[in-house]
């Protein structure tokens, strides 16, 4: 028997996991314990953080539309992902996926992180653009590792206040 099973109908898999591809879960990993983190992420989903991935990330917008806010050279840029689009994001490009459409689905493929290689999560000031907070983590599980980091940032006025201009980051997207 093959470790990851035999081929399966991916559209049917998405339909069967649709209840996990919307808030509050929003994503589902296709295979466990592989060399790749293969995830389907659904909408609606709005994020206020920017991910600093040490490796490339592959996006394939299967259903609906989404976009990525990118933080490049001190300013925010936008990359649209229309249904059917694929995109390869280079390593260390800060990005914040935005999935405003209910029922949307995006295949995201990332490399597993070797020991000692960390991911960064950053929040920027809406008023002046300076970095408000950065946290690094040895990412083992997207589902288990990220919520405590995000909750700590959202719960702390100290972490959310911009040291440069004093503006308060609004916290969690609504």
From Swiss-Prot:
Belongs to the 3-HAO family. Catalyzes the oxidative ring opening of 3-hydroxyanthranilate to 2-amino-3-carboxymuconate semialdehyde, which spontaneously cyclizes to quinolinate. The keyword Nucleotidyltransferase does not apply. O2 binds at residue 47. It comes from Burkholderia lata (strain ATCC 17760 / DSM 23089 / LMG 22485 / NCIMB 9086 / R18194 / 383). Gene3D superfamilies: Jelly Rolls. Homodimer. This is 3-hydroxyanthranilate 3,4-dioxygenase. Pathway: Cofactor biosynthesis; NAD(+) biosynthesis; quinolinate from L-kynurenine: step 3/3. Its EC number is 1.13.11.6. It catalyses: 3-hydroxyanthranilate + O2 = (2Z,4Z)-2-amino-3-carboxymuconate 6-semialdehyde. InterPro entries: 3hydroanth_dOase (IPR010329), RmlC-like_jellyroll (IPR014710), RmlC_Cupin_sf (IPR011051). Pfam families: 3-HAO. Its cofactor is Fe(2+). Fe cation 2 binds at residues 125, 128, 162, 165. GO terms for molecular function: 3-hydroxyanthranilate 3,4-dioxygenase activity; ferrous iron binding. SUPFAM superfamilies: RmlC-like cupins (SSF51182). Keywords: Dioxygenase, Iron, Metal-binding, Oxidoreductase, Pyridine nucleotide biosynthesis. Binds 2 Fe(2+) ions per subunit. The lineage of its organism: Bacteria, Pseudomonadati, Pseudomonadota, Betaproteobacteria, Burkholderiales. The keyword Oxidoreductase applies. Fe cation 1 binds at residues 51, 57, 95. Disulfide bonds: none annotated. GO terms for biological process: anthranilate metabolic process; L-tryptophan catabolic process; NAD biosynthetic process; quinolinate biosynthetic process. Substrate binds at residues 57, 99, 110.
């Amino acid at each position: 028997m093959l470790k990851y099973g035999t081929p399966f109908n991916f559209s049917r898999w998405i339909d069967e996991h649709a209840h996990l591809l919307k808030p509050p879960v929003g994503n589902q990993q296709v295979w466990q314990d592989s060399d790749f983190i293969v995830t389907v992420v659904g909408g609606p989903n709005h994020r206020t953080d920017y991910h600093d991935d040490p490796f490339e990330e592959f996006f394939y917008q299967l259903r609906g539309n989404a976009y990525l806010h990118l933080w490049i050279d001190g300013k925010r840029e936008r990359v649209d992902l229309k249904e059917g689009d694929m995109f390869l994001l280079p390593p260390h490009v800060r990005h914040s996926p935005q999935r405003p459409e209910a029922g949307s689905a995006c295949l995201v493929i990332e490399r597993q992180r070797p020991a000692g290689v960390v991911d960064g999560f950053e929040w920027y000031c809406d008023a002046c653009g300076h970095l408000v907070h950065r946290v690094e983590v040895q990412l083992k599980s997207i589902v288990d590792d990220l919520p405590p980091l995000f909750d700590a940032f959202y719960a702390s006025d100290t972490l959310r206040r911009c040291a440069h201009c004093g503006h308060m980051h609004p916290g969690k997207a609504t």
